Amino acid sequence: MDEEILNIQVRKFLKKVGIQSQREIEQAVKNYINKGSLSGAEKLDASMLLEVPEIGLKVSIEGKIEIE
């Protein structure tokens, strides 16, 4: 196994996940603010499930997104 290649591939995947998930969250928040369902000052609970079935990896990452 080439650790440098693994590192590059993991970073590429995480970059894709980060960009796509940020877009999805921002769009959903804007939609809910426009509908009046959010005021724009909430703290939203967020979670992400990272799963790689071939190696038995399943990790839940939790946090809060503060909207100001």
What residue spans do the PLM features occupy?
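Long, contiguous binding/interaction regions
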Residues: 12, 17-20
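Alpha-helix boundary/capping and short turn/kink residues
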Residues: 19-22, 38
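N-terminal intrinsically disordered, cationic/polar leader segments
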Residues: 2-11, 27-30, 37-68
